[in-house]
Amino acid sequence: MGLKSLFPTAKPVGEILALGELLLDFVPTRSDMRLSEPGTVIKTVSGSAGIFSCAAAALGARCGLLGKVGRDPFSRLAVETVARSGVDTSHVVRSEEGQIGLAFLEYLPEGRNYQYYRENSVGSRFSAGDLDEEVVAQAQILHLPGMLLELNESIRGACFEAVAMAKRHGVLVSFDPNIRGELRWGGEARERMLRMASQADILKPTLAEARQLTGREDVWEILDVLHGMGPKLVAISQDKDGALLSAGGQVVASPGIDVPVVDPTGAGDCFAAALCRCVQRDMPLEEAARFCNCVGTLVCTKRGAVGMAIPSEAEVEELMASGLCRAERLIRPGVDEKEQGRGA
């Protein structure tokens, strides 16, 4: 059975709608170039919702973006780039006040380092009043990245209002906690993440995020807690170790694929887009695990994300057919295989 069987009352067709902030990344052309040094950089569109929506479009989905930009050159560049990627930007609000956030990247031996210039960015000032319920109602899936919940009250309120609209109209809710180190975590922030996760139909944390959300270490306990919150489909991305997908009593693992990692920017957002696309295509759980794993892997092999590293549907299918990407069903310790549901 395919993933659509998890959501019997969901709309059979429709677009994927992403809510969030567009950013512009300045990516160095050399991995040894530091922010304190002169050198050449490439401008590329970023922001979780921007990367997600472009990835969904590249994978064959009809996808739209909800957000707010300014009328500055950086905003125009971001919107035009996303639109050229096949995303419907007609519902992006154009504001006379402010510009989109900027991020400058450097590659350090211990990982990536971002210098953000996004405080009070126009994108973070998207509000519930900027939402059009008719637009949300027409979607099949609404996707939100969790880091929006910690930017400010304005966009946080928009996120929860958009979910309320989605629930009123039978729109599936996809949520990626996207917990960022530069934002606060714990206390009220954790409660907001848990509140949003409990309203999601599709949940995609990393393993570290799943542990933070649940307070558990064992993966079976983690899945029990996450499903207990409400999501029917849970996908846990594990960086180089691949991914786990859980639904309908089944758990499938797709091990990591050995490739040279150039830049992991956007891999999680593209993985989330792939997961939503798998639901649209009604893939069986094992095929979905392989598909998502392949998408996340391919993104890591190139620098940048939008217009540079996001793979096409054909590229993903080619990697799936190569035999390098596997998936296997996992059986809970101490449970008979026949007792562990067949599910999706």
State where each predicted segment sits.
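Glycine-rich phosphate/adenosyl-contacting loop at the front of the ribokinase-like
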Residues: G2-D88, V262, R326-A344
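Conserved phosphate-binding/catalytic region of the ribokinase-like
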Residues: G2-L17, A164, G215-A344
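Active-site metal-binding loops of divalent metal-dependent hydrolases
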Residues: G20-L22, M147, P177, C270
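Short, conserved phosphate/pyrophosphate- and ester-handling motifs at nucleotide-, phospho-/glycolipid
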Residues: A56, T206, G268
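Glycine-centered short loops/turns at secondary-structure junctions
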Residues: G60, G86, R168-G170, G230, ...
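Conserved N-terminal subdomain of the carbohydrate kinase-like
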Residues: R62-G146, V316-A344
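Structural alpha-helical scaffold elements that stabilize or flank donor/cofactor-binding regions
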Residues: E134-V135, R195-M196, H227
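Conserved beta-alpha-beta core of the PfkB/ribokinase-like small-molecule kinase fold
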Residues: I141, M147-D224, D241-A243
